[in-house]
Amino acid sequence: MNFTKLFAIVLLAALVLLGQTEAGGLKKLGKKLEGAGKRVFKASEKALPVVVGIKAIGK
């Protein structure tokens, strides 16, 4: 009957609507990873000259 066509349309609509919700969670995770990467980069920028200076003194 037409039940299979109706079921397919409802299923497709649900996938489209619920698929957008999933992207929000992945976006939040991406932002957290990006923030962690920035913090590590800034910390290494501060620490690297100190490490190079200690290594130069030890020569």
Curated annotation (Swiss-Prot):
It holds the Pfam family Cecropin. InterPro entries: Cecropin, Cecropin_insect. GO terms for biological process: antibacterial humoral response; defense response to Gram-negative bacterium; defense response to Gram-positive bacterium; innate immune response. GO terms for cellular component: extracellular space. Induction: Up-regulated in salivary glands after dengue virus infection at day 5, 9 and 14 (at protein level). Its main location: secreted. Salivary gland (at protein level). It is found in: Secreted. Keywords: Antibiotic, Antimicrobial, Immunity, Innate immunity, Secreted, Signal. Residues 1-23 form the signal peptide. It comes from the Eukaryota. The keyword Transmembrane helix does not apply. Belongs to the cecropin family. PANTHER family: CECROPIN-A1-RELATED. Antimicrobial peptide. Exhibits antibacterial activity against Gram-negative bacteria, such as Escherichia coli, Pseudomonas aeruginosa, Acinetobacter baumannii and Klebsiella pneumoniae. Shows no antibacterial effects against Gram-positive bacteria, such as Staphylococcus aureus, Enterococcus faecalis and Enterococcus faecium. Exhibits antiviral activity against all four dengue virus serotypes and chikungunya virus. Exhibits leishmanicidal activity. Partially neutralizes lipopolysaccharides (LPS). This is Aedesin. It comes from Aedes aegypti. The lineage of its organism: Eukaryota, Metazoa, Ecdysozoa, Arthropoda, Hexapoda.
